[in-house]
Structure formats: C-alpha cells, structure tokens
C-alpha cells in the first residue's frame, strides 16, 4: 500500500532545532532537508536529520563550537560537517551548486551559494528536493509534494542530466520506488534505461548497497518486472533469466517471471516480514537454471544440479557486491537446499536442521522455517497443480515446531556426551580427532542409528 502525504506529522526534533537555532541566531539561514522532510510528510518514521545553511562550513564550525556543540569535518570539500547534539549526528551542508561529474559519481567542483533554491535544484528527485522550517513552512520549488501525493519518483530538472551526473541514482530511483510503493515517472523511467550503462563506472560495493536496499524493501518481485533492464546492469546474472522458457509441465512462466512471483509470494506468506536472507534467496534461488538447462528426447526441460550450482552463483554475486558473510552464507545455503526434500518426520527434521547448523551455526531453526517459506512460495509460483505442495509444507512446519519443542538433537551441544567423555572413553588425545568423533556421533543420533543416551554413546565409542 502506498503512503500519502498529509503535512509534516511532527516537529523537528529538539536536538536538530538546537543546531538550526544556533545558526539562525548568528544571522544565517538554515533549513531541514532531505529524507527527514519526505518521511515527515508521509507520516513515516524519521531518523537522521540533515540541515542546509547559508553559512560556510567554517562558520558552522565556529558558531556551533561557541555553543559547545562538537563538530566533525566529514566532507568539507563539499561543504559538509557533522554536528553531534545529545549524542545524535546532524549533517550540516553549505548551500552549493555542483560542476561536472567526470567520474559519474562525485562532482569535480562545488561552488557555495547563498540561495537555498539553487541548492535544492542539484538534488536527485523531487521528493528529496524539499526544505522545511518550523516557522517558514515547506519550501517546494519542484512540486515534490505533488509527486508524493501521486506516488511518483521524478528526477529534478532533466532526468538524463541527473543520472549522468551520478549513475548510482539509477538504482536509487528503483530503491525509492520499491520502498515507498511508488512508480517511476515516464520521462525519468526512459532516462533510467538509457543511463543504466553508467553503473559500469560505479564501485561494486555501492551497487551492492543499493541492490541490497531494493531486496530489503520486499518489492524485488515488482522491480524484476518493472525495472528489468536496470537490474540486469546491476546484477548481470539476471539477464539470462529474461524470457527463458523452462519447457516444463510444472512451470507456467519463464525463469524471470517465476522468480518475480516467488519474491512476491514470500512476502505474502510472511506478512511482509520476510528476513533479508529469505528475500535474497527468493531472488537468486533459480539463478543457475539457464546455465544448467538440458532437454530430453521429448523436448522437456531439466535443470539437473541447479540448486548446487545456484548456491555457488549466489555466493559469487553477493561477494562481488561486497555483501557481508553473515548474509551470504545463509542465502547460499537456502539456495542449495531449496529443492531439498523435507518430510514431516523427526529424522527429516533433524537432518535438515543439521545441514543448516553446519553451514550457519546458531541459525538453524530460523533458516529451516525460512526454507519452508521459500518452498511454499516456489510451489505456488509454478503450475496450479504444484500449489498443493504448499499445503503439504504446512504439515512439515507443524512437525518442525513439534520437533524443536521436544528438544531434538541437531547440534554438537545437544549430545549427551562431551569432548571429555570422548577422551576418557577412547583414550584419544585432545585435538581435532575429538571433534570428528563427536561429529560422527551427532550424525548417528540425527539419523536415528543411536539414541541420545550417554551410556549408549560411550559404549558405542568403546566398541569402535
């Protein structure tokens, strides 16, 4: 559901007012700008407050310093300092206009000016080009409030110029559209596609931050279909998915549309509360289908080994985008196991939990539930005949909850014996061998070959 503007829902926080008033008392002009204004108009939670001012950054530092407000020089080449009031940072920037962008990311030069409207004109989108003052009200030279009400992401001025200045804005437009549930305005959309090649000049880490931001909105399903060409530039592995006919009686859609539907379905099954790991896994779960595709003599398509290959490709994509290991590892594992057969039996539950525990220690239970949500979403995004499997997964989930509640064994610490028991029973010296024996015992218990009974496990070690 798209949010609608309703006037600034709450006042500027006291800590930010402290800095703003100090600048005005010294004879300078100051406004709150950026995301705080946009979100306040939408009635959404606001976080960081940014201020723009007619004061040169050196004057900002002097004025606030006289009020015993700490100021850090965080970007003085662009007129930016960061003040800290009551432990909260406030980014304060001098009114400026910008020169050319040779690297398509940063301006080659900036010129400080004394007109806030000129400063707003350099910003990316109309919804981010508004300024607010507690007494003077809203300054909106580019009709950002209208676009908030219409649900549009519109570039300030000439769209192509905005995107050629900073190619990362191409992805920022998609992220804002996803986050707010907006559409991209027509001329801005045309420029997005024309300028998407500029992402080649952007650091992969920055691209990764934006793609991750898109995924975390829960609207990657929409983005894959509405902004395909942009996402192909950001994640080239998406390209082969476009229009790829699966030639399968179980699939009604090409790989891209199937993936889009899976992304949407995980949001439905989780009430919009899917974890980042699940959202990324939904996005990349079938990334290897185009490279593993084969056809049999009847023309039917097969994708043998695509979960395993997809796990490697998922890791490659996410590492290339410099995403953190604690996100990469669970996504890789979810992709690898998304076709793994899970039955509503204690043994199947324990084996699944063991796989996740081995790959992502301490996260097995939450990832097992994420796997079931992924499987549900996958099932309902195929042919209608496959939707019944989603109902079966409900039974598997109930079994998983029962097994976890019963204190099932799937971690080394769940075993009834410890490393010292291994040393005493076998005479082995402390070292890696102890862990190997415990691992073998855990496997035997998980597979139902041995009960998790201390005496039985010790006897088993002595016999060996």
Model-assigned labels for residue ranges:
Residues 1-464:
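Catalytic cores of the polymerase beta-like nucleotidyltransferase superfamily
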């Amino acid at each position: 559901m798209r949010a609608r503007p309703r006037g600034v829902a709450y006042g500027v926080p006291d800590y930010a007012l402290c800095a703003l008033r100090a600048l005005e008392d010294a004879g300078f002009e100051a406004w709150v700008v950026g995301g705080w204004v946009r979100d306040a108009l939408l009635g959404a939670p606001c976080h960081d407050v940014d201020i723009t001012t007619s004061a040169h950054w050196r004057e900002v530092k002097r004025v606030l310093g006289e009020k015993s407000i700490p100021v850090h020089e965080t970007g003085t080449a662009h007129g930016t300092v960061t003040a800290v009031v009551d432990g909260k940072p406030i980014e304060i920037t001098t009114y400026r206009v910008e020169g050319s962008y040779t690297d398509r990311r940063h301006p080659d030069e900036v010129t400080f000016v004394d007109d806030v409207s000129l400063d707003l004109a350099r910003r990316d989108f109309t919804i981010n080009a508004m300024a607010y003052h507690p007494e003077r009200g809203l300054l909106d030279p580019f009709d950002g409030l209208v676009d908030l009400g219409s649900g549009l992401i519109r570039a300030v001025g000439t769209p192509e110029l905005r995107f050629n200045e900073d190619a990362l804005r191409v992805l920022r437009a998609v992220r804002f559209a996803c986050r707010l549930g907006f559409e991209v305005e027509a001329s801005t959309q045309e420029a997005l596609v024309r300028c998407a090649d500029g992402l080649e000049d952007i650091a992969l880490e920055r691209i990764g931050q934006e793609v991750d931001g898109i995924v975390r909105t829960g609207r990657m399903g929409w983005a894959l279909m509405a902004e395909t060409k942009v996402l192909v530039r950001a994640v080239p592995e998406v390209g082969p998915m476009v229009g790829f006919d699966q030639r399968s009686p179980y699939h009604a859609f090409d790989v891209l549309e199937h993936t889009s539907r899976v992304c949407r379905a995980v949001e439905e099954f989780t009430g919009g509360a899917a974890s980042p790991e699940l959202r990324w896994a939904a996005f990349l779960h079938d990334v290897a289908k185009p490279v593993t595709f084969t056809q049999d003599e009847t023309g039917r398509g097969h994708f043998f080994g695509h979960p395993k290959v997809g796990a490697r490709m998922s890791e490659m994509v996410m590492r290339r985008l410099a995403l953190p290991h604690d996100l990469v590892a669970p996504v890789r594992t979810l992709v690898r196991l998304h076709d793994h057969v899970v039955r509503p039996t204690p043994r199947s539950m324990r084996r699944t939990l063991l796989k996740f525990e081995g790959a992502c220690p301490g996260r097995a239970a939450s990832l097992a539930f994420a796997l079931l949500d992924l499987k549900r979403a996958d099932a309902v995004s195929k042919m209608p005949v496959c939707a019944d499997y989603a109902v079966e997964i409900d039974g598997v989930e109930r079994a998983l909850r029962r097994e976890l509640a019963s204190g099932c064994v799937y971690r080394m610490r769940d075993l009834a014996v410890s490393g010292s028991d291994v040393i005493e029973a076998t005479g082995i010296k402390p070292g890696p061998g102890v862990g190997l024996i415990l691992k073998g015992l855990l496997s035997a218990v998980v597979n139902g070959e041995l009960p998790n009974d201390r005496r039985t496990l010790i006897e088993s070690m002595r016999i060996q």
